[in-house]
Design a protein with these regions (language model features):
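Conserved class I S-adenosyl-L-methionine
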Residues: 1-44, 149
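Class I SAM-dependent methyltransferase SAM/SAH-binding core
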Residues: 49-51, 55-99
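A short acidic, Gly/Pro-enriched loop at the edge of an enzyme's catalytic core
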Residues: 98-110
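A short glycine-rich, Lys/Arg-flanked "PGG" loop and its adjoining helix->strand segment in the class I
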Residues: 125-137
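Conserved beta-strand signature within the Rossmann-like core of class I S-adenosyl-L-methionine
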Residues: 138-145
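Short, glycine-/aromatic-enriched active-site segment of Class I SAM-dependent methyltransferases
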Residues: 146-163
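Short alpha-helix
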Residues: 164-180
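Core SAM-dependent methyltransferase catalytic element
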Residues: 195-231
Length: 231
């Protein structure tokens, strides 16, 4: 097993694939609520990039059911294999998200839940900058981030070693704005909306949920209206 962060994360998600699927299918999470915010802000049949798709549920499934054309990535080949078995119509790409390449302005939207905090935070700016460049004008990015200001966190997840890295809320917001995102909505919520059992791996954790728009768009108000924001 590799001792670099990406290797730690890949190894863990390869080996917990069945447990992880059962967990995401049963866990209380705001993720579907925020995915719908993305869909509501985009045109019909949008092109969407999902980073950290896991086995394809629930987010990839929701996006496809709503008519989106999705390119989905996960670092774990096992997770991608599981997603392919369920959703062969999606374009699924295994590997490190930092190695992805797309033409500028390829996607109407992007979505990434429980994923970006597995990157060393020294790589987060470059990754967010790439996502910004891949979005079309008026593109919308919905994501969540951790809120603990720690360069390296090593722990266990379903019995396997795991790596996390994060800025705090102010640091996350500043970084997104510096890259060129307008932050339309920012919420800091307890994992599972505070309804998790004590034995849940996310019990007691907080996450920052963000709806962001590629900056300097003349239609910002239209996006905000569709999301029910700024009223």
């Amino acid at each position: 097993m590799s001792d670099v962060p990406e290797g730690i994360v890949e190894y863990a998600y390869d080996h917990i694939s069945e447990w992880y699927l059962q967990w995401v299918e049963s866990q209380n999470s705001p993720r579907e609520r925020y995915a719908r915010k993305l869909l509501e802000a985009l045109p019909p049949s949008p092109s969407i990039l999902e980073l950290g798709c896991g086995p394809g549920v629930p987010i990839l499934q929701l996006l496809l059911d709503q008519g989106a054309r999705v390119v989905a990535n996960d670092i774990s080949r096992k997770q991608i294999e599981m997603a392919k078995a369920r959703f062969p119509q999606a374009e699924l790409v295994a590997g490190d998200m930092t190695a992805l390449t797309f033409e500028p302005e390829s996607f109407h939207g992007a979505i990434s839940f429980y994923t970006l905090f597995h990157l060393p935070r020294s790589k987060l700016r470059d990754m967010l900058t790439k996502i910004h460049s891949w979005l079309k004008p008026n593109g919308v990015f919905v994501l969540n981030l951790a809120v603990v200001d720690e360069e390296e966190i090593h722990g266990e997840f379903f019995g396997y070693g795991m790596f996390w890295s994060s800025y705090d809320v102010d640091g996350n917001q500043a970084l997104l704005r510096e890259i060129g995102f307008d932050l339309l909505q920012v919420d800091v919520l307890q994992a599972g909306d505070g309804k998790l059992e004590e034995d849940d791996p996310d019990f007691g954790a907080e996450f920052m949920w963000v709806v962001a728009r590629k900056k300097d768009s003349p239609t910002k108000r239209n996006v905000e209206t569709m999301l029910g924001l700024g009223e």
